[in-house]
């Protein structure tokens, strides 16, 4: 019979965020630039004019692209093939991911060969081996780093990756061994912009995806705290819990489908309405599944928390704000990330965390606990709850 460990020998079950960085693509893509690209290649049609009207009203100041305005990608007469899109991701996306990762590692204060786990996520590439394999070599990670590559989860991918890394590091804690996880999200949707325009011209179905998505990479470093060194940053946030919720009857609401020229985004106009229903329900599920919070009624009040909501679009943020009874200031970092960059898919939630971290560094008064929420394909809502070091509910729930 195996004797249980004495309580004092059970490792403290906490996983912390100790490094954050993002790297948006170098070129700005404004509403005027997209309109010029569209009119260069296509004649006026009702669907094109409607898309361009939406494009002027997104409330996005600019998005980012790996392509400059004079790049061949925007001017060539033919649509890039799926194979060419794959090559473009490798040429432009992987350096973005490498830069964001290097900055996150620098922010953490450790060295690459101390990374024990790598959790990568993208929905804009499907190569084998995945970009995580290339990234290991570029960053100088150990050959036996535990790698996971996530795909097929869309805008929820940043929180999904955090959830997976969190659970992996808790496993290392149970073994009593040091663990540091690098989370990397990389999205280059403007690679598929030409094919998206072409599909819209052929089908005459208005596609708002053309107006929302931008290119970015972002990274986090997580630590289980075992073997902490003086050079390592102290925890920025501790992860209390992560909770995914898949909603029945929503399978046709959001897709990112494969076709012969790349990916085609389908974004249903019902998404803001669904956000207003899904996010409060997911929040209640998150709190009820967090033992250190579940028993007190006050913990089910959304306004008692800070918030980072993925900006699927402006209407999505407004719907979440209204449904949760929050103010625009409560979601200021989400609105700021949307204005500066638009929807950068799985990377966006990490950009928002970076903004909140920087605010806190400059003396911003923030609540001790922070709720993250992002709707991905499925529809699946990914949520997480973080807490500042030193606040109550420190231990993993």
Swiss-Prot record:
Protein EC: 2.3.1.-
UniProt induction comment: Expressed during 1-3 days of culture in DPY medium.
Result of altering residue 377 to F/P: Leads to complete loss of catalytic activity
Catalytic residue list: 155 (nucleophile), 377
Source organism superkingdom: Eukaryota
Disulfide bridge positions per record: none
GO biological process: polyketide biosynthetic process
Enzyme class: transferase
Amino-acid positions noted as binding substrate in the UniProt annotation, renumbered to this chain: 214-215
Binding site for CoA: 50-57, 267, 312-315
Gene Ontology CC terms: type III polyketide synthase complex
Coiled-coil ranges (or none): none
Molecular-function annotations in GO: naringenin-chalcone synthase activity; tetraketide alpha-pyrone synthase activity
Pfam families referenced in this protein's UniProt entry, alphabetically: Chal_sti_synt_C, Chal_sti_synt_N
Sorted UniProt keywords: Acyltransferase, Transferase
Function according to Swiss-Prot or TrEMBL: Acylalkylpyrone synthase that catalyzes not only the polyketide chain elongation but also the one-pot condensation of two beta-ketoacyl units to produce the 3-acyl-4-hydroxy-6-alkyl-alpha-pyrone (AcAP) scaffold, a precursor of csypyrone B. The enzyme reaction is initiated by the loading of acetoacetyl-CoA onto Cys-155, and subsequent thioester bond cleavage by the nucleophilic water generates the beta-keto acid intermediate, which is placed within a pocket.
Subunit structure: Homodimer.
Family in the record: Belongs to the thiolase-like superfamily. Chalcone/stilbene synthases family.
Protein name: Acylalkylpyrone synthase csyB
């Amino acid at each position: 019979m195996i004797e249980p460990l004495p309580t004092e020998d059970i490792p403290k079950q906490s996983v912390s965020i100790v490094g954050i960085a993002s790297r948006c693509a170098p070129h700005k893509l404004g509403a005027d630039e997209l309109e010029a690209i569209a009119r260069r290649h296509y004649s006026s049609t009702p669907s094109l004019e409607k898309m361009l009207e939406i494009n002027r009203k997104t409330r996005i100041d600019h998005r980012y692209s790996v392509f400059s305005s004079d790049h061949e990608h925007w001017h060539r007469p033919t649509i890039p093939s799926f194979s060419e899109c794959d090559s473009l991701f490798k040429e432009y996306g992987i350096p973005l991911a490498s830069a964001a990762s290097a900055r996150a590692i620098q922010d953490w204060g450790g060295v690459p060969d101390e990374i024990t786990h790598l959790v990568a996520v993208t929905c804009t590439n499907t190569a084998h081996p995945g970009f995580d394999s290339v990234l290991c070599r570029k960053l100088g990670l150990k050959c036996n780093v535990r790698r996971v590559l996530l795909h097929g989860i869309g805008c929820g991918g940043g929180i999904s990756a955090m959830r997976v890394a969190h659970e992996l590091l808790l496993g290392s804690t149970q073994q009593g061994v040091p663990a540091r996880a690098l989370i990397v999200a990389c999205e280059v949707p403007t690679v598929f912009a030409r094919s998206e325009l072409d599909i819209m011209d052929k089908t005459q179905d208005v596609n708002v995806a053309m107006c929302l998505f931008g290119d970015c990479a972002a990274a986090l470093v997580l630590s289980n705290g075992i073997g902490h060194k003086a050079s390592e940053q102290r925890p920025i946030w501790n992860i209390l819990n992560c909770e995914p919720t898949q909603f029945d009857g929503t399978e046709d609401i959001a897709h990112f489908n494969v076709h012969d020229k790349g990916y085609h985004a389908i974004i249903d106009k019902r998404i803001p309405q669904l956000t207003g229903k899904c996010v409060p329900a997911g929040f209640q599920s998150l709190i009820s599944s967090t033992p250190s919070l579940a028993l007190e009624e006050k913990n089910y009040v959304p306004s008692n928390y800070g918030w980072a909501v993925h900006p699927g679009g402006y209407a999505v943020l407004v719907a979440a704000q209204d449904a949760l009874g929050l103010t625009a200031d409560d979601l200021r970092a989400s609105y700021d990330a949307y204005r500066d960059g638009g929807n950068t898919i799985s990377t966006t939630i990490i950009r928002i965390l970076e903004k909140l971290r920087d605010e806190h560094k400059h003396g911003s008064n923030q609540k001790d606990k922070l709720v993250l929420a992002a709707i991905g394909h499925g529809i699946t809502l990914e949520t997480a709850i973080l807490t500042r070091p030193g606040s109550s509910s420190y231990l993993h729930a």
